[in-house]
């Protein structure tokens, strides 16, 4: 098995060198204990050169090293020993073996024969082509090494991991996205939304991260409620004062083409660092932001509406980005076509081939579900998902078991496997009632019996009522009394989803959807299908344009903004969506 794995590594690294990718790959050391079993003269004479002897001779050209451990040096061919540039020589009392060691050393050790025989535990001589003379070294016992570092044998695994992390200059960062602060209107949900944000920052600080990344949609609006901004700023400043930078990009919600976003204001105040900095030219160049402590290089693109995202990606100067060395993070706020969940097939996306290749980490946002994807030629492509949830569909997924949180990433010259850190500010309870075939009165009583069997104390309850009533109106099912009953049972928050409820007596627009943007899109699409529209763009993108226009028109007047300024901003936003230059005066 070891031979198969080593051969595959060697083959891939040969290929990386041929394609110019080798310098961005980590150096690999392959360790063989009892080395004569695979590198012995008899083995090679009987089987011919194997992958280990090949790596001994050629591996360094492809950033692969071989570490052979043995006391019986004489069993290994001189041709193999000669290609091992550094030898750590421990005590050996066998004269024949000492002779082979001395004969294959990079320096003249003929006067050290007896010294090698008398080397004690922890004593060694290093002979290497990289030094002018052999170097005596002292190797501490593992127990002494741990004690000198201030650790004891009973210390936890976390203590040991932290010790090695510091010793190996391993760094950490937290990757968050889609916090959507200010999305929730219900006071308790708004508090939980913020609590999730605070808990994530606290957890990341406790994990001693070196920096944080928020991959878009920190706020639910580009001009959020001022109380939301105040609380968020206090938390972000607390992180910054702890010596932890926060790197962000715009999401599709907190970007505005016509006015200053709250992201810009927070950057001006020194609370966060916006990392998307285009370089003008025929191709779209991107400037890297270098983290001062770790040397990590961060760049990327912000979220945009509709097809604008793909246009920006197509203009990218990928060749220049790929040529940059170091540990690179590409920050983005877009769905990737190859990784879209099946039920999100309608979501606009960007093809992976438009991304620069070879970055060590791809920090994604916009998709509200967590995911970590590995694709050849790319570092980990990671979506943390929404931190709490901005829509009813998100909260329903929470209640059905979807975990929310952020990713903790450790790295040296490459990223280790990202660790998902769950953040749970509240417990959820999911209740689903299918009332198909019931009249409205029977359906109401069935719902009452169903909820009575659930423990909802202190929980956020997501009640989904679906099915087609045989008679009666859907409004006959009294949501207010159902909510009161659940609250009397101790529920903290009650959300009732009736989108899937219909009746045979009345059928208007048929939709079965709980995610508000997708619900709006489906309604617009159904209405468009009934219109005689000759404009090709409206036929193909009409639903997307309508949803985006609706979202822009929902923006409230900002503090200090007078009526004419507000109207001008709304008109310019609408023009941006429609692809028109309205000039802010409606003309």
UniProtKB/Swiss-Prot annotation:
Keyword Nuclease (UniProt): yes
One GO process term, biological-process aspect: double-strand break repair
Active site: residue positions: 253
E.C. numbers: 3.1.-.-
Pfam families: Metallophos (PF00149)
Mre11: region residues: 170-587
GO molecular function list: 3'-5' exonuclease activity; DNA end binding; endonuclease activity; manganese ion binding; Y-form DNA binding
Residues holding Mn(2+) 2: 217, 333, 366
SUPFAM superfamilies in the record: Metallo-dependent phosphatases (SSF56300), P-loop containing nucleoside triphosphate hydrolases (SSF52540)
InterPro entries membership: Calcineurin-like_PHP_ApaH (IPR004843), DNA_Repair-Maintenance_Comp (IPR050535), Metallo-depent_PP-like (IPR029052), Mre11_archaea-type (IPR032885), Mre11_N (IPR041796), P-loop_NTPase (IPR027417)
Needed cofactors: Mn(2+)
Region: Unknown, residue numbers: 1-169
Alphabetically ordered keywords of this record: DNA damage, DNA repair, Endonuclease, Exonuclease, Hydrolase, Manganese, Metal-binding, Nuclease
Regulation: Nuclease activity is regulated by Rad50.
Record note on cofactor: Binds 2 manganese ions per subunit.
Residue positions binding Mn(2+) 1: 178, 180, 217, 368
HAMAP family membership: Mre11 (MF_02044)
Protein purpose: Part of the Rad50/Mre11 complex, which is involved in the early steps of DNA double-strand break (DSB) repair. The complex may facilitate opening of the processed DNA ends to aid in the recruitment of HerA and NurA. Mre11 binds to DSB ends and has both double-stranded 3'-5' exonuclease activity and single-stranded endonuclease activity.
Protein name: DNA double-strand break repair protein Mre11
Organism, scientific name: Methanothermobacter thermautotrophicus (strain ATCC 29096 / DSM 1053 / JCM 10044 / NBRC 100330 / Delta H) (Methanobacterium thermoautotrophicum)
